[in-house]
Amino acid sequence: MIGPPVNLPKWLEENSHLLKPPINNYCVYNGDFTVMIVGGPNARTDYHINTTPEWFYQHRGAMTLKIVDPTEGNNTFRDIVIREGDMFLLPANTPHNPVRFADTVGIVLEQKRPAGSLDRMRWYCQREGCGAVVKEAAFHCTDLGTQIKEAVEAFKADEEGRRCKQCGEVAEWCPKPGSIRDPNLE
């Protein structure tokens, strides 16, 4: 059965309590496409790698999409600010960390994963000048609402598994307060 349209402001008024850390997402549609409403703030340091493109629309406030850009050679870390009213299409297989700030809301649309495809959650060393891969988890994504959260929670619980094999730094499981510039304060 085809359901009715979702009035986003009304949905947020009635359901914003469903947007819970560490991901703060809620899947409103989950079929051939997954449509998530995502609120802020969130607390994660992972970079998600999806074999399909992801579409972002920022309904309220601005967010920062931290990416590892393979097109600039040597996997350059960079930030893309998506402001209120902006939409952005992230190419498939681009490592990305969506950073959401207080009182912000966005919509993310993802395709259903092809059979046999693996999503990856990757954590990089945060020490200046290092950037080595600290840990990577792979899974066939069938439920975005729970699987990403499970991977983040497992990383949080494994302090020794967060140690960089290249420099010895222990990676943070969530960003340190004030470590990421909030474009909403500019």
UniProtKB/Swiss-Prot annotation:
It catalyses: 3-hydroxyanthranilate + O2 = (2Z,4Z)-2-amino-3-carboxymuconate 6-semialdehyde. CDD domains: cupin_HAO. Its cofactor is Fe(2+). Keywords: Cytoplasm, Dioxygenase, Iron, Metal-binding, Oxidoreductase, Pyridine nucleotide biosynthesis. A divalent metal cation binds at residues 125, 130, 164, 167. The keyword Metal-binding applies. SUPFAM superfamilies: RmlC-like cupins. GO terms for cellular component: cytoplasm. InterPro entries: 3hydroanth_dOase, RmlC-like_jellyroll, RmlC_Cupin_sf. Pathway: Cofactor biosynthesis; NAD(+) biosynthesis; quinolinate from L-kynurenine: step 3/3. Fe cation binds at residues 48, 54, 96. O2 binds at residue 44. One of its GO terms (biological process) is quinolinate biosynthetic process. One of its GO terms (molecular function) is 3-hydroxyanthranilate 3,4-dioxygenase activity. It is found in: Cytoplasm. Its EC number is 1.13.11.6. Substrate binds at residues 54, 100, 110. The keyword Kinase does not apply. Catalyzes the oxidative ring opening of 3-hydroxyanthranilate to 2-amino-3-carboxymuconate semialdehyde, which spontaneously cyclizes to quinolinate. Belongs to the 3-HAO family. This is 3-hydroxyanthranilate 3,4-dioxygenase. The lineage of its organism: Eukaryota, Fungi, Dikarya, Ascomycota, Pezizomycotina. The gene is BNA1.
